[in-house]
Amino acid sequence: YVQMVCMCSGEPIITAPVSTNDLSISIENIRKAITPKTKAIILNTPSNPSGRIICDDSIQQIAQIAIENDLIVITDEVYKTLLYDNAHFKSIVTCDKMKERTVVINSLSKEFCMTGWRLGYVAAPSELISVMTMFQENIAACAPLPSQYAAIEALRNSEKYSAGMIEEFTLRRNVLLEEVAKIKTITVDAPQGTFYAMLNIKSTGLKSEEFAYALLEKEQVAVVPGITYGDCCEDFIRIAFTLDIYKIKEGIQRLKRFVESL
């Protein structure tokens, strides 16, 4: 989001989470970040990279902040169906008086594994859609017709296609958590959604980027250093459990071997 805001000549302000140990969203920090120049709030729930879901109470508070300060809320909901342990997702657009000031972004890439199709959609007030349409028509015109038909099929039968995937990702997540629990110096909170997990590596004494590069070089395991997501995530690395269970186990075993060699 930072690069996109900068491309539009805006100034992105990143709000820190509750703490470096708790990556939950901080309502207090959001309030402090608001200035007379603020135009919008960008949300991502369930969150990449933390896998956290913004709870209903926090969603209501953010909606109130937006109304009080006359702000647009841009909500990225591409992981909203990838939920675990009966987790509940609430879209801010459903809050009172938010329909007229919310931009909902979604994609077929995550829910339907259609990353290569480059298909997504947005729902927003008509005046914003008009501006977006002008931009879209001059950049890409429209998605190819076969892609559009694929999207229609996916959206019309979303439950049929996503149910099996959610079941599989639940198994992968549980295997990941079980394997990481065997590593004494690394901890992980169970993600509520998405297919990402943030592993706390603070006790290893390495910075996240140093850790990630060394792990790749020595064990050929690729992770994302937490610093990529801001200073608040320096103590973490992000793992995506998008591979099959065998490869997840193998990857975590290599991670364990690497940590024990430090």
Regions found by a protein language model. Name each.
Residues 1-262:
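PLP-dependent class I/II
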